[in-house]
């Protein structure tokens, strides 16, 4: 059985992070590029948002008895049998790669790539909606 209260709390945190990232994006590219603190805030919030998706996804994989992933990127593919859209899973796997750069490759962080990621925040919201739906069902979707 999926611990919906734990998942819901994490998804609420994800929503707060994405809302802040939306506000940064709404400030415009020029302001983003000109302000080191804004870029730093975006990088950190994006890292936390992606990590939250990974954590929720890993929890769901475990609770639903799905195939254990080999790495963070694989968490999203493992959720496809439970009903996560495969195209969304691919985009989220790429986001996990961005998270790795934000965590480990701080000298290699590309401001343009982070800015571009702010245009894909809908993927994080779509993931949250899918996890809410799958969590409420409490079981993996049947294999097709």
Language model feature labels by segment:
Residues 1-144:
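Solvent-exposed interaction patches of small proteins and small membrane subunits
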């Amino acid at each position: 059985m999926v611990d919906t209260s734990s998942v819901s709390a994490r998804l609420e945190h994800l929503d707060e992070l994405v809302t802040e990232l939306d506000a940064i994006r709404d400030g415009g590219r020029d302001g983003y590029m000109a302000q080191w603190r804004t870029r730093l805030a975006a990088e950190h919030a994006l890292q936390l948002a992606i990590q939250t998706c990974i954590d929720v996804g890993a929890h769901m994989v475990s609770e639903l008895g799905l195939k254990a992933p080999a790495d963070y990127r694989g968490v999203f593919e493992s959720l496809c049998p439970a009903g996560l859209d495969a195209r969304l899973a691919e985009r989220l796997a790429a986001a996990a790669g961005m998270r790795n750069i934000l965590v480990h490759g701080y000298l290699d962080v590309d401001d343009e790539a982070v800015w571009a990621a702010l245009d894909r925040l809908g993927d994080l919201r779509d993931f949250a909606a899918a996890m809410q739906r799958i969590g409420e069902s409490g079981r993996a979707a049947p294999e097709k």
